C-alpha cells in the first residue's frame, strides 16, 4: 500500500483530464478554438515513421472490413478521434502522478509546482499548434485559450492532491484519496463532461446547407462541360438500366468518401482565404474565391479512389466537380524557363506536386464546386485539385499555395514510402445480384456494380458464373 498515492494521483489526473477535454471540446464547437487532443494526435502522425503509419492504416482498414464496423472512412476517423482523446486522458494520469511526486518532495512550493505544471502543459500544447499552423482564431486567442485551460487544470489538480493529503494527515500522504473523495471527483468530472457535450451538441447541430445534396440516379449528357464530356443522350438512353441495389452513379456530397491526414478537417474562412501562386513564374499572383468562381469554369464527372481501398472496398466515389483548368492559371502567371513541376501546399500541412506536362492537361481542374454547390469543408473548401489518372493521395484539398519549381517536387505520402505515381489499378466490384428480381422478358438475373481504371477507361466487363 506504500505506492497507493501513485494510483490515486493517476486517477485524479485522469478524471480531471476528462473535464479538461470536455471544456476544450466545448470551446471547439462554440468558438472554433483549437482542440488539443486532436491536434496532438495529428502532430504525432506527422512525425512518426511512414512505415509505422502505413502499417496502422492497413491494419485499421482490415479490421473495419473484417468486423463489418461500418463505412471505412467515417469509422476510421472515429477510431482516430477515440485514440486521440484516450491518449490525452492517459497523459492526464501521468500528469497527476508527476504533480503528486513533486508535491511530496516539496509541499511548501505548492504554488510554484502548480504554476510550472500548467506552464509545461501550455508550452507543449502551444508547440503542437505552432507545428501544425494556427487555426482560424489567430495566435493571441489560441495562446490565451491554451494557457487558461492548462493553468486551470494544474491548479485544480494540485488542490485535489493536497486536499486528499490533508484528509490523511496522519499518514502525511499527498495524493491518496478515499472512496468518498473519489466519487466526488468522478461525479464532478462526469458532470462537466456531460454538460459540455450537451452545450457543444447545440452548437454543432446540423443546419440545412446547399452542400447536402442527394445522389443523382443517372448521369445525363449535360453533366459535363469539359474535355471529359458525357456520351450523347441517345447513347445514354440505350444503356441497360442499373440492377436493383446498384450504387448510384453519382455519390452525394454527404456520402463521398473522406480520407485525409486530419482528425478534423480545416475550417477555412472563405472571406479571408487566398491562394498564392509564385516561384518560377513571370507574374506572381494571389487568388481569392471570387477570382476563381467568377471566371469560366468547366464541369467533369470524376471518379476518385483511395490508394488504401481494398478489393471490394467502399473508398470509391463519383461526383460532378466544377473548376478552372490549371493550364489557364499557368497561362496567367507565366512559367519561367527551368520550371519543371508545380508544388502544392494545403492548409493542413499536406503537400504534393505534379509535373508541368501533367499540369498542362486540360482535364486538370482547380475545383471550387462539387455537385453544383461550393466544396463542402470536409472535401477541401474552398479549393482542391483534380488530377486524372491518380489516386486521391496525389490530390491535395484546402490548397493555399502553389509554386513553380525547378525540381520534381515533394509529396507527403511519397516521402513516407508510398507510390511515386499512384496510378490506379483496374477495379471491378459487384454491388448486387438481384436474384429475386429477374428480367421479366428474358428471365435473366440482373447484376450490378462498378468498374474503373482511371484514365485507361473500361471497354467491357465480363462476368463468370459457376454452373
Indicate residue ranges for each PLM-predicted region.
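Structured, non-membrane catalytic/scaffold regions adjacent to prosthetic-group chemistry
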Residues: 34, 77-82, 89-96, 133-138, ...
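N-terminal secretory signal peptides and thylakoid transit peptides that target proteins
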Residues: 171-190
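Individual transmembrane alpha-helix segments
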Residues: 59-91
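N-terminal signal-anchor transmembrane alpha helix
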Residues: 8-33
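Extracytosolic (periplasmic/ER-lumenal) interhelical loops and adjacent juxtamembrane/interface segments
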Residues: 36-72
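Membrane-helix interfacial "entry" motifs
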Residues: 1-5, 9, 35, 72-84, ...
Amino acid at each position: 500500500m506504500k505506492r497507493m498515492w501513485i494510483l490515486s494521483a493517476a486517477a485524479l489526473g485522469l478524471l480531471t483530464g476528462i473535464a479538461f477535454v470536455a471544456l476544450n471540446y466545448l470551446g471547439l464547437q462554440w468558438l472554433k478554438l483549437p482542440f488539443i487532443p486532436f491536434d496532438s494526435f495529428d502532430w504525432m502522425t506527422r512525425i512518426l515513421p511512414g512505415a509505422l503509419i502505413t502499417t496502422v492504416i492497413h491494419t485499421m482498414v482490415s479490421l473495419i472490413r473484417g468486423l463489418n464496423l461500418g463505412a471505412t472512412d467515417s469509422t476510421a476517423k472515429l477510431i482516430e478521434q477515440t485514440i486521440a482523446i484516450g491518449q490525452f486522458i492517459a497523459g492526464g494520469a501521468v500528469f497527476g502522478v508527476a504533480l503528486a511526486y513533486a508535491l511530496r518532495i516539496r509541499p511548501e512550493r505548492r504554488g510554484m509546482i502548480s504554476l510550472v505544471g500548467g506552464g509545461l502543459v501550455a508550452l507543449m500544447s502551444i508547440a503542437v499548434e505552432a507545428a501544425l499552423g494556427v487555426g482560424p482564431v489567430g495566435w493571441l486567442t489560441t495562446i490565451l485559450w491554451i494557457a487558461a485551460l492548462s493553468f486551470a487544470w494544474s491548479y485544480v489538480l494540485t488542490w485535489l492532491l493536497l486536499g486528499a493529503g490533508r484528509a490523511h494527515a496522519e499518514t502525511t500522504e499527498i495524493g491518496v484519496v478515499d472512496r468518498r473523495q473519489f466519487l466526488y471527483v468522478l461525479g464532478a468530472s462526469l458532470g462537466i463532461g456531460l454538460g459540455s457535450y450537451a452545450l457543444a451538441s447545440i452548437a454543432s447541430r446540423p443546419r440545412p446547407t446547399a452542400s447536402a445534396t442527394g445522389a443523382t440516379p443517372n448521369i445525363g449528357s449535360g453533366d459535363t462541360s469539359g474535355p471529359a464530356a458525357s456520351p450523347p443522350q441517345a447513347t445514354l438512353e440505350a444503356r441497360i438500366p442499373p440492377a436493383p441495389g446498384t450504387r448510384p452513379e453519382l455519390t452525394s456530397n454527404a456520402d463521398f468518401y473522406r480520407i485525409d491526414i486530419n482528425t478534423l478537417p480545416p475550417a477555412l474562412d472563405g472571406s479571408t482565404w487566398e491562394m498564392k501562386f509564385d516561384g518560377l513564374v513571370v507574374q506572381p499572383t494571389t487568388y481569392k474565391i471570387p477570382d476563381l468562381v467568377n471566371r469560366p469554369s468547366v464541369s467533369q464527372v470524376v471518379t476518385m479512389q483511395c490508394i488504401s481501398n481494398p478489393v471490394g472496398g467502399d473508398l470509391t466515389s463519383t461526383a460532378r466537380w466544377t473548376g478552372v483548368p490549371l493550364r489557364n492559371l499557368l497561362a496567367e502567371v507565366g512559367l519561367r524557363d527551368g520550371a519543371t513541376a508545380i508544388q502544392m501546399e494545403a492548409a493542413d500541412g499536406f503537400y504534393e506536386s505534379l509535373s508541368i506536362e501533367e499540369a498542362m492537361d486540360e482535364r486538370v481542374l482547380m475545383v471550387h464546386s462539387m455537385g453544383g454547390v461550393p466544396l463542402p469543408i470536409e472535401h477541401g473548401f474552398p479549393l482542391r485539385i483534380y488530377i486524372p489518372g491518380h489516386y486521391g493521395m496525389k490530390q491535395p484539398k484546402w490548397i493555399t499555395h502553389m509554386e513553380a519549381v525547378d525540381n520534381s517536387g515533394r509529396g507527403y505520402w511519397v516521402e513516407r514510402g508510398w507510390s511515386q505515381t499512384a496510378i490506379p489499378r483496374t477495379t471491378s466490384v459487384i454491388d448486387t445480384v438481384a436474384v429475386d428480381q429477374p428480367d421479366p422478358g428474358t428471365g435473366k438475373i440482373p447484376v450490378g456494380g462498378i468498374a474503373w481504371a482511371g484514365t485507361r477507361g473500361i471497354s467491357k466487363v465480363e462476368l463468370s458464373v459457376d454452373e
